[in-house]
Amino acid sequence: RAEIVAVIPFYMTTLMRMMAGLLAPDEGSLRVLGLDVTRDAQAVQDRISYMPQRFGLYEDLSVQENLDLYADLHGVPQAVRRERFARLMAMTDLARFTARPAGKLSGGMKQKLGLACTLVRSPELLLLDEPSVGVDPLSRRDLWEILLQLVRDEQLSVVVSTAYMDEAERCAHVHVMNAGQVLANGTPQALAQRAQGLTFVATPPDGMAARMLQARLLDAVSTVVDAVPRGGRVRFIRRPDVDEEA
């Protein structure tokens, strides 16, 4: 089913590597696209694309050369490359940088190039491990617009691990996990309903940026679960076992 699913786990990278068939579970089992990732790892890898946090771009190669290299690695036929590359370039706004070395791109554009290289072979399922970490807010917004376009236009299914609640809100389903166990799952709206009475909005005092207030709230680990800037204010979630006066 074409949609974006968010996973909010501890040990995010470990889970994503297991889903990609790169790491076997210590115990239990895991199925992706109906396949057992331990027994059918190669079959899983043939149908998915995986973008880790540190995607392996070749910084001395140009944007176009990186795309060509990954197309070669994935066996993308020459007959479909021109159209596929043109579409990826248009979506990521990389068309004007085709001759630029990847190492000369901004952080946000590098992430877009990594995504384009991941998508050269039109996978059934895309796995993204915290794709917006270290990316500026504008590039982060652009990245999510690209993902939504892929789901809409190409019927692509996406699983994304993220620690950002505002990103999870843009997904069709959210799974909150810890130590391999699902703590909660459902639509963002359903999970938000469960948090009713635990979610608050704080306004920074004069002279304080929302990001600074967010940092202070996140430092209060005994009382605050998460805090996200939103429109100059900060929305935060209080731990359910803490008195409201705390």
Predicted regions: what is each one?
Residues 122:
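Conserved catalytic motifs of ABC-family nucleotide-binding domains
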